[in-house]
Amino acid sequence: MKQITKFLILVGVVSFTSLSQAACSFDVEVGDYLKFSTPDMAVEKSCESITVNLKHTGKLPANIMGHNWVLSADADVQALATEGMSAGLVSNYVPPGDARVLAVTSVIGGGESTSVTFS
């Protein structure tokens, strides 16, 4: 099993770490205060793909308090968060074409939802 743990900067950046509970699909909620509802994710090796469904439960628009969900290795979290801020909203706060980004959702505002499926 692999586990994905969420690390928050201004975007949700996650990385692989130790084990918790297992699943192949995850529902994650985040509001206007950057508090993600799912602190960690454990993925069974048998999962052919993983889906993350992100829902913004707040009221502020994406250009004010937008959120996305990003998967990367632990070692890349800080650099991606910093470089992502420079990339801006137009690039979903991730450097375009960056191989360190393993999966990413689009940035969403209050009341919106998005998802990403990856393997």
Regions found by a protein language model. Name each.
Residues 1-8:
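Bacterial N-terminal signal peptides that target proteins for export
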Residues 8-16:
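Bacterial N-terminal signal peptides
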Residues 16-22:
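Sec/Tat signal peptide C-region and signal peptidase I cleavage site
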Residues 23-49:
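N-terminal edge beta-strand
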Residues 34-38, 60-64, 78-80:
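Short, solvent-exposed loop/turn elements at domain surfaces
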Residues 35, 97-119:
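Extracellular/periplasmic metallocenter environments
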Residues 40-63, 70-71, 114-119:
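Beta-strand cores of secreted/periplasmic/IMS beta-sandwich domains, seen most often
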Residues 66-99:
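The feature marks short-to-medium sequence segments in extracytoplasmic or secretory-pathway proteins
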